[in-house]
């Protein structure tokens, strides 16, 4: 019996030595955010293939991985053959093109082992017009016209807008966020955050942080109340982005940049992080790459996003 105990102890010790310790996550004030499009990040377009690239991203100095929506995409009114990630059919499932839920969980576990935070894109304003909720939930969960048709905003014919006058919508959206927190994600990048009642974010973020105090929240929006009222850690510095474009074109200059920095600091709480970038998936799609917009100044502008006060750089 003594020999067996010694052997078991030795085996456990060997296993412990062979397992690399999990790397500590960086403080938010030192963090760099990386936007990942799973479909296009690798030739395979899968979680498993993206997982193999995590060591390279770690070497680049990335700290927070923001995954563009990973959920199944609606078929009805789909844009093109692939559809938009932001026309979500099922909030609690993964896009089968990317792999299985187990594949995502493996990706998440490996990312955490390497010290990354992983946040998911949370599209709370709308779903696809053939989403699971459309088929299973009351009609008044959605905004509808006088004929009962779901409402379409802008040219987004591939979505249906949710009705936040219904308490049930608040509860269901908070529930799907909790589902992913229970999976182990570290927070969310919230699409069109100001199109959803700020009070929803306030209530939901507060409730989730009671159980997950380290949850990181990034808002696609620039309203200061996203921080002071709703509890977001970070928000988009859109005005800065447009100013950097203008400076690169010679339309604005450094004094105007300094004035912006001062006014932005006055508008936002002292602990608010501002997401700073020269490009993202919206700008790259509609306004051109940073090199097309900024020319030879693109690299200099990228340096500014890493060095300006309260900034959190996005790659």
Regions found by a protein language model. Name each.
Residues 175, 186, 191-274, 304:
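Active-site-proximal helices and loops of the catalytic beta/alpha 8
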Residues 6-11:
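Sec-dependent N-terminal signal peptides
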Residues 20-48, 52-63, 69-183, 203-212, ...:
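Substrate-binding/active-site clefts of carbohydrate-active enzymes
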Residues 32-36, 65-67, 118-120, 188, ...:
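Hydrophobic faces of well-ordered beta-strands that scaffold small-molecule active sites
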Residues 1-4:
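Positively charged n-region of N-terminal signal peptides that target proteins for export
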Residues 262-315:
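Active-site-proximal substrate-binding groove within the catalytic cores of carbohydrate-active enzymes
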Residues 15-16:
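C-terminal motif of bacterial Sec signal peptides marking the signal peptidase cleavage site
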Residues 99, 168, 195-196, 292-293:
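Alpha-helix N-cap and loop-to-helix initiation/capping positions
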């Amino acid at each position: 019996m003594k020999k067996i105990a010694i052997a078991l102890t030795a085996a456990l010790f060997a296993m412990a030595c062979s397992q690399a310790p999990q790397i500590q996550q960086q403080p938010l004030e030192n963090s760099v955010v990386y936007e990942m499009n799973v479909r296009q990040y690798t030739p395979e377009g899968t979680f498993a293939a993206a997982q193999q690239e995590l060591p390279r991203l770690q070497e680049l100095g990335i700290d927070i991985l923001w995954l563009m929506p990973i959920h199944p995409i609606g078929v009805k009114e789909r844009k093109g053959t692939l559809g938009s990630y932001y026309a979500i059919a099922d909030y609690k499932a993964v896009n089968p093109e990317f792999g299985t839920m187990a594949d995502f969980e493996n990706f998440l576990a490996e990312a955490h082992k390497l010290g990354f935070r992983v946040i998911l894109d949370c599209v709370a304003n709308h779903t696809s017009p053939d989403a699971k909720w459309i088929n299973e939930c009351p009609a008044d969960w959605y905004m509808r016209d006088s004929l009962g048709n779901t409402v379409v905003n802008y040219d987004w014919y591939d979505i249906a807008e949710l009705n936040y006058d219904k308490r049930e919508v608040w509860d269901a959206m908070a529930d799907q966020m909790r589902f992913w927190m229970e999976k182990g994600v570290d927070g969310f990048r919230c699409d069109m955050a100001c199109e959803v009642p700020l009070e929803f974010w306030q209530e939901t973020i507060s409730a989730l942080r009671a159980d997950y105090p380290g949850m990181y929240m990034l808002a696609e929006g620039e309203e200061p109340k996203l921080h002071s009222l709703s509890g977001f850690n970070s928000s988009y510095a859109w005005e800065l982005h447009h100013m950097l474009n203008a400076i690169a074109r010679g339309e604005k200059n450094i004094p105007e940049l300094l004035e912006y920095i001062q006014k932005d600091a006055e508008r936002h709480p002292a602990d608010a992080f501002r997401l700073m970038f020269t490009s993202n998936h919206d700008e790259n799609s509609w306004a051109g790459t940073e090199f097309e917009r900024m020319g030879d100044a693109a690299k200099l502008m990228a340096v500014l996003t890493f060095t300006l006060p309260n900034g959190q750089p996005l790659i």
